Amino acid sequence: LKPALPGFPGLGRKLLNILKTPWEGPSWKTVPAGAFEDLFFIARPEKANEYIALVKEILTKYTYPHTQLGVYVQPIEHNRACQIEFTFFYDPENEAEKAEIAAIALEAGTELLKRGAQFTRPYGVMVPVIYDRAGNYTATLKRLKNIFDEKNILNPGTLCF
């Protein structure tokens, strides 16, 4: 960044510090329970209610209270699509709760995928599910990784392999 922005002398230096530390303390997402699992994807806006109902229905099979489910819907592309995000908050010290959240996210993500949700940035428990279904994509990622990192020293294990 430039040290000064037009009309705002010295803001460039201040802005860099603000961007590096947007808030003090832990992330707002860890405050409710200590940890969270996100399930996010792209969908058609008219499918949002169906997907929310599906996840709430899946929750009835588990002990996780649906009132603690975080739901975020962000219209994109002038509302031709939307990003939908489900956040499952849990106590990272409670192994049973952690395992239950992983099971919920995996079941919900798999069902959402079957119903047309587009997981364009696989994350968490959905990584193996998405990459297993996208063999050509995975093979292409491996070839690209090999071109730029022949010795596999940059972030080994962080892609789908």
Positions of PLM-derived features:
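Conserved glycine-rich FAD pyrophosphate-binding loop
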Residues: 1-161
